[in-house]
Structures are given as C-alpha cells and as structure tokens.
C-alpha cells in the first residue's frame, strides 16, 4: 500500500446509537457497545466522535470505553458535570446549549448566564460550546451572532 494514501485511521468515525436511546445502560452495554467498540477500533489516531441527542449520563461510563474516543456530544439533556466526572480531560466535550431557549425567549443576559453555567460545570475539561439542531430562529437570525459573541466571551473568561 502507498504510504501517502489515506487510511481509515486518517478519518473521523461518527459513532451514534440514536435508535437505541430507549435502551437502559445494561442493554446498551450488552447489545450496542460491542459493535461500537469494533467500529471505533481502526481509528488509531483518536478520531472517534460519539454523538447522542438524548441524556447519556447513565451510558457515558460505558461509552467512555470506546477505543480512540476523542470527542463526546453533551446534549442539552445531559449533565455537563456528569460528563466531566466520566471523561475528565481525556476527550473534548462538545457541550450544546438548548436552541429552543436561545431563540424563544432568552435575552442576551439569559444566554450569558446559561453559557457561564455550562463553562463552570465543565471546569477541568476541554470543551467546545455549540448551538445546533436549530429548526427555527423564530424570525430573529441576529440571535445567532449574539449567542456566538456570548459563547466566545464565556470561553475567554475560562
């Protein structure tokens, strides 16, 4: 094989078990985790991303055993503090603000408080603040910029 040719290890694996969100931790560990571990194994440069929109607090200790895990999705329904207890600084926590709160009633001050809370809960961990799964900006697209400014400032105060 040509040494310059890309390999699977050069890519990112997107691991998700959204269809298994209704499974409890025991069934998840028995039925889903083994195939996720096999899927993640070839990504030897630690380029595995785990995504789950549901609350993953109870499953995170199981997911933490994925080989080559580098990035973990912390949805608005998951606890940032629980993710930090599970992963520490071993992965980047992709921490998501709740888009419904941002676009349907939040003031700049509300956004700031929410972001500062997320940052404080993530003390000691590498984080990436995100606002995604946006289905409507409620006629206020400028809020995207406001949220981004507040997120940058919250991160800078860290």
Please state what every model-predicted region is.
Residues 1-158:
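Active-site loop segments of alpha/beta catalytic cores
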């Amino acid at each position: 094989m040509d040494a310059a040719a890309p390999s699977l290890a050069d890519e990112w694996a997107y691991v998700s078990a959204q269809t298994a969100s209704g499974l409890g931790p025991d069934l998840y560990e028995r039925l889903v985790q083994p195939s996720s571990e096999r899927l993640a194994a070839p990504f030897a440069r630690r380029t595995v991303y785990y995504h789950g929109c549901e609350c993953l607090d109870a499953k995170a200790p199981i997911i933490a055993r994925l080989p080559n895990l580098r990035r973990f999705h912390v949805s608005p329904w998951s606890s940032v503090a629980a993710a930090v207890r599970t992963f520490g600084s071993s992965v980047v926590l992709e921490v998501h603000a709740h888009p419904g709160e941002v676009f349907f009633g939040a003031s700049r001050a509300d956004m700031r408080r929410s972001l500062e809370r997320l940052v404080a809960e993530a003390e000691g961990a590498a984080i990436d603040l995100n606002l995604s799964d946006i289905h409507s900006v409620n006629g206020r697209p400028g809020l995207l910029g406001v949220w981004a400014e507040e997120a940058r400032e919250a991160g800078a105060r860290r």
